């Protein structure tokens, strides 16, 4: 079992948990994720690691309360324990110096984007971050992003903060003013779908970090399978990052919606 060291509310249904996991903290890299379970009969939920402190032996997770299991995690407090925490899983982000990198995050996807932003910036890239949220209250980790990038562009659906518009508007504004060598996108599948469609038009290599339904995290169950370039891939072992222009997002969206009625219970 893993103890929760601290808890912070980003909004009414989004929390940040700092969890004791010294082995994971030492070995994790940008892009890695863990699978979390609360209670012996709880659902196994994949969560990308948003940060780690090797000195304290902790990792940071950001969770949005959507279904029953994620709500249970969000209800935990400092001092409580997570029943199972497995990781680090998946393939780490390929980090190299490529030039200008645009990192686009929507919603809670901003959290796992942070270590990727940090890694690309440390590698000597010019990193521009586009943060998107519905309203000002839902914008998270802006300060941390500014500390680890060259520029941060904030987009809100209602214009209550930053610039009114969608994440794609922010990304395109950068493309229109300077050469972009790589785009990394994380967030809801529909957000990544439209970011991918935009960058494909401009022939900009793009990586999408996918968060699909998972059970075992080893590729055995096949719950996380997706189609990439016409071939079946498993997000838990082959990903979570893929060439966004090759991902069948429509299929992914259909699979993600398969259990929505059950998740509401």
What are these regions (language model features)?
Residues 6, 51, 154-156, 208, ...:
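Structural signal for conserved beta-strand scaffold positions within catalytic alpha/beta enzyme cores
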Residues 71-215:
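FNR/FR-type flavoprotein reductase catalytic core
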Residues 234-238, 242-265:
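Short Fe-S-cluster ligation motifs
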Residues 1-80:
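Ferredoxin-reductase
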Residues 39, 87-88, 229:
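Short, surface-exposed secondary-structure boundary micro-motifs
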Residues 112, 189, 211-241:
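Local cysteine-cluster metal-coordination motifs and their immediate loop/turn environment
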Residues 42-50, 89-99, 236:
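Short, Lys/Arg- and Gly-enriched loop/turn segments at beta-strand edges
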Residues 36, 84-85, 226:
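A generic structural signal for residues embedded in beta-strands
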């Amino acid at each position: 079992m893993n103890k929760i060291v601290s808890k912070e509310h980003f909004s009414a249904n989004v929390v940040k948990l700092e969890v004791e996991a010294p082995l994971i903290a030492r070995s994790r890299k940008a892009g890695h994720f863990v699978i979390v379970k609360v209670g012996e009969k709880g659902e196994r939920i994949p969560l990308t690691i948003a940060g780690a402190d090797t000195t304290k032996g902790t990792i940071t997770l950001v969770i949005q309360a959507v279904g029953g299991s994620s709500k249970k995690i969000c209800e935990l407090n400092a001092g409580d324990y997570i029943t199972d925490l497995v990781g680090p899983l998946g393939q780490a982000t390929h980090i190299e110096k490529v030039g200008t990198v645009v990192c686009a995050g929507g919603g809670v996807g901003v959290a796992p984007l942070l270590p990727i932003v940090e890694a690309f910036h440390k590698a000597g890239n010019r990193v521009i971050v586009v943060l998107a949220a519905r309203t000002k209250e839902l914008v998270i980790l802006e300060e941390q992003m500014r500390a680890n990038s060259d520029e941060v562009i904030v987009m809100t659906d209602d214009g209550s903060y930053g610039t009114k518009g969608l994440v794609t508007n922010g990304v395109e504004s950068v493309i229109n003013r300077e050469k972009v060598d790589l785009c990394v996108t994380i967030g809801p599948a529909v957000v990544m779908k439209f970011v991918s469609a935009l960058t494909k038009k401009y022939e900009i290599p793009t990586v999408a970090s996918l968060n699909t339904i998972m059970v075992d995290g080893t590729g055995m169950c096949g719950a996380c399978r997706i189609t990439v370039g016409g071939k079946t891939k498993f997000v838990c072992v082959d990903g979570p990052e893929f060439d966004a222009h090759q991902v069948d997002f429509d299929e992914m969206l259909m699979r993600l919606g398969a259990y929505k009625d059950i998740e509401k219970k």
